[in-house]
Amino acid sequence: MTAKTLIVLIGPTGVGKTELSLRIAEYFKTSIISSDSRQLYAELKIGTAAPTPEQLKRVPHYFVGTLQLTDYYSAAQYETEVMSVLEQLFQQHHVVLLTGGSMMYVDAICKGIDDIPTVDAETRELLLHKYDTEGLDNLCAELKLLDPEYYKIVDLKNPKRVIHALEICYMTGKTYTSFRTQQKKERPFHILKIGLTRDRAELYDRINRRVDQMMDEGLLEEARSVYAHRELNSLNTVGYKEIFKYLDGEWDLDFAIEKIKQNSRIYSRKQMTWFKRDEEIRWFHPEQEKEILSYLQASIK
């Protein structure tokens, strides 16, 4: 019997994961699990380059358009739900494909998330109220006092991370750091990681053209439709936050579009830095489809 294998197809934004993922899934007659933390939201289609209705017809997808913007969701929830879906899918397929560029979500499945206590609604509301009334800087100062170790490594510009760490400190009386064991979990399937990469100039050109295409497809209208929710963490996202600056009257539209391109390029560099630390990834150019399929076939057998 062939071992269960999860193919993990990763790479920076704009590299060309979508079409190749469809072709790999069709080749193995299997389903795709998205590991894009923004494609989860039904309202965010254009700005997240979510699979089109035609692409969704070609291959069954999971974790695309399943949430509303106001839904709270975490990488820990994602891990639990994906593991449950994988258990079902592996009863029908010996190979399943996971693809996307959200580094934390990929790691949640490949390595696992630490068992951190579930935050109660009262604590969550308290800290969200503090964030709204006192601002992020005050919360960062509080985190420095309660968990100086995590304060040194957390992205202090990311309110969701800062708030979550404080929630755990408030609720348990312990540091958030004390729950972060970062021990890799054993998985009941084999994991094969394929990384896609391009020459930087080639990737940047693709990113720039993709942003232009998103604008042609109606990104401005999509951003306008969710503008009322602009304070949500789910919309602190490249492509939306820049358009909001235009809608606020701070930037003109051409400048906002250039900032989307620039911030997308910066994000692609961050993704590559994260992925390059993983020695399990086998790297290919997206056009090396034949080589990728040969490698997968040999590795799965």
Swiss-Prot record:
Q: What is a GO molecular function of this protein?
A: ATP binding
Q: Which cofactor does it need?
A: Mg(2+)
Among Pfam families, the record links this protein to: IPPT
GO BP annotations listed: tRNA modification
The keyword tRNA processing is annotated on this UniProt entry: yes
Q: Which residues does the annotation say bind ATP?
A: 11-18
Give the span(s) annotated as Interaction with substrate tRNA.
36-39
Record Gene3D superfamilies: 1.10.20.140, P-loop containing nucleotide triphosphate hydrolases
Give the site residues for Interaction with substrate tRNA: 102, 124
Binding residues for substrate: 13-18
> What EC numbers are recorded for this enzyme?
2.5.1.75
Catalytic activity of the protein: adenosine(37) in tRNA + dimethylallyl diphosphate = N(6)-dimethylallyladenosine(37) in tRNA + diphosphate
Write out the coiled-coil annotation as residue ranges. Answer: none
Its annotated function is as follows: Catalyzes the transfer of a dimethylallyl group onto the adenine at position 37 in tRNAs that read codons beginning with uridine, leading to the formation of N6-(dimethylallyl)adenosine (i(6)A).
* Subunit and interaction comment: Monomer.
Spell out the NCBIfam families in the cross-references. Answer: miaA (TIGR00174)
Q: What protein does this entry describe?
A: tRNA dimethylallyltransferase 1
Q: Recall the taxonomic lineage recorded for the source organism.
A: Bacteria, Pseudomonadati, Bacteroidota, Bacteroidia, Bacteroidales
Encoding gene (name): miaA1
